Amino acid sequence: MNNAAILVPGSLESVLDRHIDLIWQVDLRGPLLLMKHALPHLQKAGGGDFINVSSVAAVFPGPGPYENVTRGDGAFYGMVKAGLERASQGLARELQSENIKVNVLSPQGRIKTPGNIWADNDPDNPSLEFEAADEMGKATVWVCEQSIEFTGNILYDQDLCKEKGL
């Protein structure tokens, strides 16, 4: 399960070049390298699962027009999460014949991580609510229990838990 990520705040005009490089390195390149280096172990074991953690930011905000626009509120994070989703589906297609599943699981709320706790302390955003991490855990177990045909999916934890009664 690939779960490491960072958020780079700022607008296109204000973001530092090194921060763009950093979010690519951590949020997209990191999971791909982890998968690359774990792959021989899954092949040796005769199969397994990769679950890449994405975010609803991969599809947010959707088509315009937009109201109440806040500049610099996640375009870069959404960009790398969308890239991770696309890469995951491509790799699912490549690895299915080796009995290796690749799926994407996104929390639908904010999980209580150090980064989200920091955001919760932001005076501009004082009332963030957190999602219990157990829904991600239950959804992860369910995904891993599925047959090899269940690969290349982009899933959302709360929807999956509700749909499957987890």
Predicted features along the sequence, with ranges:
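Structural signature of the Rossmann-like NAD(P)-dependent dehydrogenase/reductase core
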Residues: 2-3, 49-55, 61, 101-106, ...
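Catalytic loop of short-chain dehydrogenase/reductase
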Residues: 51-97, 109-110
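C-terminal helical subdomain
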Residues: 104-105, 122-166
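Catalytic Tyr-X3-Lys loop
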Residues: 6-8, 13-33, 51, 77, ...
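Short beta-loop-alpha junction of Rossmann-like oxidoreductase domains
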Residues: 10, 59-63, 100, 104-120
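Amphipathic alpha-helical dimer-interface segment in Rossmann-like NAD(P)H-dependent oxidoreductases
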Residues: 26-46, 57-58, 92-93, 97
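Hydrophobic positions on the long internal alpha-helix
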Residues: 1, 34-38, 42, 87-88, ...
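Conserved internal alpha-helix within the Rossmann fold of NAD(P)-dependent oxidoreductases
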Residues: 30-35, 49, 59, 84, ...
